[in-house]
Amino acid sequence: MKKKYRYLEDSKNYTSTLYSLLVDNVDKPGYSDICDVLLQVSKKLDNTQSVEALINRLVNYIRITASTYKIIFSKKEEELIIKLGVIGQKAGLNGQYMADFSDKSQFYSVFDQ
């Protein structure tokens, strides 16, 4: 199995499940940003070169946004974020130095609509 697909199915499953859990709170501050990013990552998972790096950026974004808006996740939501974090750890530290984790635009490209 290619390395690219190693964590693809788990990542798809975890992001879609987390989105379905969080979408009910979309009217609360911070939740809409997290849900937008979860949708964007779900779209990009099939075409990304490194699933692990994308998931790593996602988890960092979720953590910083949750901290900013003082979001407290349920036990099930937290378990999914931890599982995504384990996948993201496989990417290592490349590209994280001096990165802006709170920037939502890192998940969008110029060509996205």
Swiss-Prot record:
A Pfam family hit: EntA_Immun
Xref: InterPro entries: LciA_Immunity-like, Ta0600-like_sf
Domain of life of the native organism: Bacteria
GO biological process per UniProt: bacteriocin immunity
Assigned keywords, A-Z: Bacteriocin immunity, Plasmid
Gene3D superfamilies: Ta0600-like
TM regions (residue ranges): none
Function summary: Imparts immunity to mesentericin-Y105 to naturally sensitive host strains.
Homology family: Belongs to the immunity protein EntA family.
Name of the molecule in the record: Probable mesentericin-Y105 immunity protein
